[in-house]
């Protein structure tokens, strides 16, 4: 493995000159800079980012923690954050916790060992002591914690829109899928739907769900139709759950939306490709990731911030799993 001394020798310059070039610290003649870059490419030399951050006392690494990379919603968040951070000269260290506390704690330790400048966390455990005890900033993404910086969407309004749409389509026996009880964002969605359903005085029942994962969604969909076979409308906590319900409804010979209406939440890219295409509530996932990165960098750079708890608007996307009644 090549070292900085090897690069200096190949470029015909001193180690100090290579170091100035790498750290953009001090004057380096353009011709010399070109020789150093060429030598680095020839020797396949890449500087150690952690060592550079320790030397400069300024890390350019950001930790990003997601709960489930198999859910297409979360890569959209990640891409938004990554694009904004890259634009500002930062790099991501990524962790996928699989909604497991042990893995999450291990990744937090990894971030610490790599001297990250801050963390963006779409965590299932925002109230962990580890977050409040960190000596670098944390921004929660698609999650909230009172008093902590966060970027989320208006889930309360979003699922009110979903409930209004499903009632407008004349469903009378509605099943509401409630997301994990310990996540405030999931409970905002639940409470928004609850308000509208009670006002409409329609029959409805609630199924509690422990996670947003694909595996759990499949078993939940089977439970739904086993427990409530007469259900003619489903409001899901996310598009993964809605897709599982759609699949199970079709498997049982139901016509969608004639026999049952289904509305998801997130508007993942695959939602419009399902058959029939899924009606859903669109979260601006890419923009949420981007805003989380902007917020974190603002905190790192000690910039004045107008707001640290950002809530972004959502929209109802009516496709073919809901009826359009006059």
From Swiss-Prot:
DNA-binding region per UniProt: 4-23
GO terms classed as biological process: regulation of DNA-templated transcription
Coiled coil regions in record: none
Molecular function GO terms recorded: DNA-binding transcription factor activity; transcription cis-regulatory region binding
Keyword terms of this UniProt record: DNA-binding, Repressor, Transcription, Transcription regulation
InterPro entries to which the protein is assigned, alphabetical: HTH_LacI, LacI/GalR-like_sensor, Lambda_DNA-bd_dom_sf, Peripla_BP_I
Entries under Pfam families matching the protein: LacI, Peripla_BP_3
Ranges of residues in domain HTH lacI-type: 1-56
Keyword Mitochondrion: no
Transcription regulation is among the record's keywords: yes
Function: Transcriptional repressor for the ribose rbsDACBK operon.
PANTHER family in UniProt: LACI-RELATED TRANSCRIPTIONAL REPRESSOR, RIBOSE OPERON REPRESSOR
Name of the protein: Ribose operon repressor
Gene: rbsR
